[in-house]
Amino acid sequence: MSSESPLLEKRLSEDSSRYLRLQKWANMSSADALGLEKERPEEKAAAAENPLVFLCARCRRPLGDSLTWVASQEDTNCILLRSVSCNVSVDKEPKLSKCRDEDGCILEALYCTGCSLSLGYVYRCTPKNLDYKRDLFCLSVEAVESYTLGSSEKQIVSEDKELFNLESRVEIEKSIKQMEEVLTALQKKLREVESKLSLASRGS
């Protein structure tokens, strides 16, 4: 048990940080069916400009995005989306929910079409007090990674600038000069060969 403890603590830490990352965006998202507080205009603009893409944690296929975000559930460690991508397959065999406070909920399991990773479930039948969950896709935070659109923009600009800094320019000019010297030497040898061939043809 003691040898498993560090691994368990590491997994819990990873899951917590992943959930907090998704929850951070949730705090900026629009009000959902649970009656979350409405966001300020600047928060709404920020969320629209930098939406999240949710990826399969195993094969990195896109599963959905934050534009279809409805809510996050801390008790079940999952996020609720209105729709998902074609990379999510639905097992049509209905199952009863085993989660606390979800008695009477009928679910269908969700899997990644690329790697068959279990992603969560979709609510197909719910009691009246949980009607807001019906037909929503519940993705487990453990099975989801996220990518913020535009997050690599600064890095790309930095790389572009790096290509044209003074040091790189000197190296490029040095390489061009070396290539010119090689071409000049090859042209000289080519002329010598052509001259010898010309003399040989005359002698014959």
Curated annotation (Swiss-Prot):
Pfam families: Yippee-Mis18 (PF03226). It comes from Mus musculus (Mouse). It is found in: Nucleus; Chromosome; Chromosome, Centromere. It comes from the Eukaryota. Keywords: Cell cycle, Cell division, Centromere, Chromosome, Isopeptide bond, Metal-binding, Mitosis, Nucleus, Phosphoprotein, Ubl conjugation, Zinc. There is a cross-link at residue 133 (Glycyl lysine isopeptide (Lys-Gly) (interchain with G-Cter in SUMO2)). Required for recruitment of CENPA to centromeres and normal chromosome segregation during mitosis. One of its GO terms (biological process) is chromosome segregation. One of its GO terms (molecular function) is protein-macromolecule adaptor activity. Homodimer, and heterodimer with OIP5/MIS18B. Identified in a complex containing MIS18A, OIP5/MIS18B, MIS18BP1, RBBP7 and RBBP4. Its main location: nucleus. The lineage of its organism: Eukaryota, Metazoa, Chordata, Craniata, Vertebrata. This is Protein Mis18-alpha.
